[in-house]
C-alpha cells in the first residue's frame, strides 16, 4: 500500500465540509448553506485537510470544489464570525489568515486539476477560491462579486493578486473598487470562468439565456420558475472525464508550469496581506463595515472622511488613545467619548 494509502472520504468526520470520492474524482463541498457557504475557521481547516488528502490519494485524478444547495458556491469568510471574534482580537485574525493561506495553497499545490463548480454566487473569498482553481463551470443564475472595500477589508487573499492577470488591469480595478455583481454572461466574456451552463427552468422548459427577472423568480420559486443544476452536474462530470484522459505526471507538471505567474503574485504579497489585515483589524473600518453587514444597514463611509477632513482620527472610533480621562483619571483614553465630548 505504500506510505500514502487511500483513505475513505467518510473517515475524516468533517462537520462543515462534505467530502466524497468516486471513479477517480474527489468532490469537496462547503456544507454551510444556512450561511451561504461562508467558510468558518473550522471549515478552512477541513477544506485544507480534504485537499491534501485528495492530492496524496492516487485513486483521485481530478478534484471538484463546490458549495451546498443552489444559492451560493461560497461567500468568503463568515462575516458574523469576523464581527464577533476577529475585530476584538486582531492577533487571532493573523492566525485565521494562516489557515486561509493553507486552504488556498492546498488548491494551488494539489498537483491535480481542480474544477470550481459554481452552483451559486461566488462572493469575496468565494471568488478567490474559484480563481485558485484551474477551471470553472458556472451556473447561469450565479454571479461573482467582491466586497472588501465595502466591509472594511481588502480582497488580498487572491483577488488583488490574480484578477489583473485573469481579466486585465482595468477590469480588475473595476471589480475591486466598485464591488458590483458580475453576472454569468459577463464573467464568461471577461474570462473569469470557462463555461456557463443553463440552470433556470420553467416547468419542463430550459431557459437557455435567463434574464435577471427570470433568475430572481427561479430563486424564489415563483411563476413556475426554478433552479435546476442537473446540466451543471453533467458538464462538470464531462469535464472531469476529459481531464482524466491524460497522463497524471504530465498533468501535474503542466499545472506547476501554468501556475508560475499565480505563484509569483501570491507569494510576493500574501504574507504582507496577512500582517496588514491583522493590524488593520485594530481600526474602526472593519468594526463598522462588518457590523453594518451583520445588522443589514448601510455602512457609514462618509463619517471617516468627514473626521479626517476636520483634522480628526479616521482610524479609531472615538479618536486615538492619547488623553487622560477627566472623569476617572484613566490614562490612554480616547480623545472623545461616545457623546463626542473630550475625555
Regions found by a protein language model. Give the residues of each.
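Glycine- (often His-adjacent) and acidic-residue-rich active-site loop
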Residues: 67-105, 122, 150-152
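Crotonase-fold acyl-CoA enzyme core
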Residues: 105-248
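Conserved CoA-thioester-binding segment of acyl-CoA-metabolizing enzymes
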Residues: 1-66, 230, 314-338
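Hydrophobic/aromatic residues within transmembrane alpha-helices
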Residues: 28, 65, 78, 129-131, ...
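C-terminal long alpha-helix characteristic of the crotonase
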Residues: 33, 137-142, 193-271, 279, ...
Amino acid at each position: 500500500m505504500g506510505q500514502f494509502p487511500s483513505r475513505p472520504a467518510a473517515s475524516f468526520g468533517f462537520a462543515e465540509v462534505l467530502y466524497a470520492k468516486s471513479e477517480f474524482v474527489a468532490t469537496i463541498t462547503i456544507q454551510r448553506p444556512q450561511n451561504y457557504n461562508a467558510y468558518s475557521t473550522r471549515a478552512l481547516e477541513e477544506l485544507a485537510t480534504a485537499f491534501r488528502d485528495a492530492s496524496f490519494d492516487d485513486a483521485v485524478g481530478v478534484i471538484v470544489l463546490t458549495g451546498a444547495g443552489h444559492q451560493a458556491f461560497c461567500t468568503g469568510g463568515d462575516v458574523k464570525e469576523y464581527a464577533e471574534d476577529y475585530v476584538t482580537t486582531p492577533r487571532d485574525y493573523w492566525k485565521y489568515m494562516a489557515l486561509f493561506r493553507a486552504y488556498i495553497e492546498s488548491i494551488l499545490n494539489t498537483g491535480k486539476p481542480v474544477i470550481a463548480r459554481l452552483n451559486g454566487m461566488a462572493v469575496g473569498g468565494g471568488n478567490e477560491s474559484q480563481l485558485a482553481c484551474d477551471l470553472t463551470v458556472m451556473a447561469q443564475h450565479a454571479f461573482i462579486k467582491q466586497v472588501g472595500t465595502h466591509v472594511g477589508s481588502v480582497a488580498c487573499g487572491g483577488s488583488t493578486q490574480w484578477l489583473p492577470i485573469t481579466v486585465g488591469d482595468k477590469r480588475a480595478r473595476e471589480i475591486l473598487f466598485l464591488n458590483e455583481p458580475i453576472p454569468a454572461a459577463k464573467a464568461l466574456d471577461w474570462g473569469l470562468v470557462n463555461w456557463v451552463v443553463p440552470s433556470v427552468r420553467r416547468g419542463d422548459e430550459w431557459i437557455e439565456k435567463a434574464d435577471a427577472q427570470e433568475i430572481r423568480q427561479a430563486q424564489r420559486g415563483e411563476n413556475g420558475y426554478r433552479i435546476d443544476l442537473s446540466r451543471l452536474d453533467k458538464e462538470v462530470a464531462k469535464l472531469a472525464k476529459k481531464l482524466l484522459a491524460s497522463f497524471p505526471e504530465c498533468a501535474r507538471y503542466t499545472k506547476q508550469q501554468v501556475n508560475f505567474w499565480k505563484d509569483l503574485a501570491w507569494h510576493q504579497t500574501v504574507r504582507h496581506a496577512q500582517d496588514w489585515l491583522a493590524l488593520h483589524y485594530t481600526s474602526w473600518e472593519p468594526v463598522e463595515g462588518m457590523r453594518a453587514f451583520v445588522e443589514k444597514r448601510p455602512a457609514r463611509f462618509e463619517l471617516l472622511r468627514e473626521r479626517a477632513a476636520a483634522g480628526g482620527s479616521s482610524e479609531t472610533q472615538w479618536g486615538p488613545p492619547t488623553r487622560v480621562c477627566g472623569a476617572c483619571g484613566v490614562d490612554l483614553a480616547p480623545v472623545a467619548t461616545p457623546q463626542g465630548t473630550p475625555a
